[in-house]
């Protein structure tokens, strides 16, 4: 099952669940080496102004997709109707010939079971290129491939601080996180990233940093596109 989950995009057209962060970007890159991407799926919050997973603005999301060279299928959803909306998008991708869903999940079985369930209901196979790889290997490969990402969300209750916002994910910074007892991939929700360049991008995104926002135990750094990218 492990091997199948890693390689099910082999010689297939696939749809990628895309958050705009490091894990989904690396998974997309890996799948593109063996299969053919047809569309990105991005789930939005109820108002349809930001991504559901990372709180990323629509401008950034569309700029990422343009730089990658792929269209986006998106839907606004509450957590209550998230699954049904996601399945509808997956079913829509079949008209493009999609056979497989690619996700950036690493080792959380609950996420995998959910992914497999929506794939079964959509008659797609599931591909998780990063599945059960060592987390340090994943983030090191991400950086060494030339991806550039910025820390945009931190959980202040899990060892992260406001000073971490805006940090570029580098090998030196990852080592610092590990020394602080923080998972290098942020798999416990310690942090989220926004990818602004990498081998899947035809050109980098030029962004400016907004004012830090707070909500409960989270701090957020909004990113906006410079005028030339709009």
Q: Could you say what each language-model-derived stretch is?
A:
Residues 1-230:
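Nucleotide-activated chemistry modules centered on ATP-dependent adenylation/adenylyltransferase
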């Amino acid at each position: 099952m492990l091997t199948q989950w890693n390689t099910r995009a082999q010689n297939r057209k696939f749809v990628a669940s895309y958050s705009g962060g490091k894990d989904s970007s690396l998974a997309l890159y890996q799948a593109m080496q063996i299969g053919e991407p047809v569309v990105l799926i991005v789930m939005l919050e109820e108002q349809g102004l930001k991504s559901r997973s990372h709180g990323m603005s629509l401008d950034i999301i569309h700029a990422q997709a343009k730089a990658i060279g792929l269209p986006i299928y998106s839907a606004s959803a509450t957590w209550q109707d998230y699954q049904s909306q996601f399945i509808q998008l997956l079913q829509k991708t079949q008209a493009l010939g999609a056979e497989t869903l690619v996700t950036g999940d690493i080792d959380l079985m609950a996420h995998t079971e959910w992914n497999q369930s929506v794939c079964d209901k959509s008659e797609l196979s599931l591909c998780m290129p990063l599945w059960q790889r060592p987390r340090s290997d994943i983030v090191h490969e991400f950086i060494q491939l030339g991806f550039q990402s910025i820390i945009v969300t931190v959980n202040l209750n899990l060892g992260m601080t406001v000073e971490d916002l805006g940090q570029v994910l580098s090998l030196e910074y990852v080592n610092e996180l590990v020394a602080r007892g923080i998972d290098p991939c942020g798999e416990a929700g310690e942090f989220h990233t926004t990818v602004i360049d990498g081998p899947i991008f035809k050109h980098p995104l030029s962004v400016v940093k907004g004012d830090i926002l707070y909500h409960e135990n989270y701090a957020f750094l909004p990113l906006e596109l410079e005028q030339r990218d709009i």
